[in-house]
């Protein structure tokens, strides 16, 4: 794993968060380098700047290294991005008092003079971000977006024109391009939340824009809902909750249980919280945590059931280390006799990991693509 970042005379040591030993993963990519080179070559001075979708702080660390007084407004939906940026600022002895942090639902400041962005994987979320920017950016404000060259096409440039202003792409460098968009100063209305029903479970679901499977029940969740365990559970964790559908169904099946919803995405946690209220479930039984797995779950919470539909990517990176951390956290936090109940793609071979961690693993159900596994502490 490469940790030495060297671009445009800026030297940093950067790590992913949480730590990963996978040799092909690092805390930045060529699009970060391209953005920084574009800034430095353009002679950009320190003006109020928004940095959006900065995975682990490469952009904020680089600008802070250039000028410790550079006023930076850092926005991300991912808790691990905040924690990674904080870790990398401390590691490189960079100030934090020039940073103001925002989630993807917070109101952005109105004095921005420059925006740096990374193109997210979810283009519905990206369009939402552009609409939010349109509400605060003055006409003529420059927005620079770094992305893989293969992700940039006429349709993407049209997304800019529709939601923020005209845009053009640079020449390719290390298989990346920088898109320059000039705000037209016209505020756009934000889109309404996506809502849909699961009639067989009498659930009404709403999703914010960065939530997985935004307008339907994904296949993994479907097979999980049909195969939840029986038992008199008192404390349940929906780990990587997304819109909260597993925890919502658990609340119906185990009405005496406290349900804890945890996700790295702030929009996911907000969606789960809204869905809990919209389905008229008891307020005192639902608990919501924007967290890196169960890292900051209160000490007194000792679950007897953890439900998990683990992701196998972090941003653009395909990786199983998030699932591994989820399984480790479940083993650490479950009470003795407690159950980890997961769904995963067959080819990911999660049964090997669970057998290694728990010394037991049972196949509960399966189909051609997915498998439900259960391990007991």
Swiss-Prot record:
It is found in: Cytoplasm. It is an enzyme of class 2 (transferase). Its main location: cytoplasm. The keyword S-adenosyl-L-methionine applies. One of its GO terms (cellular component) is cytoplasm. Keywords: Cytoplasm, Methyltransferase, rRNA processing, S-adenosyl-L-methionine, Transferase. GO terms for molecular function: 23S rRNA (guanine(1835)-N(2))-methyltransferase activity; nucleic acid binding. Belongs to the methyltransferase superfamily. RlmG family. This is Ribosomal RNA large subunit methyltransferase G.
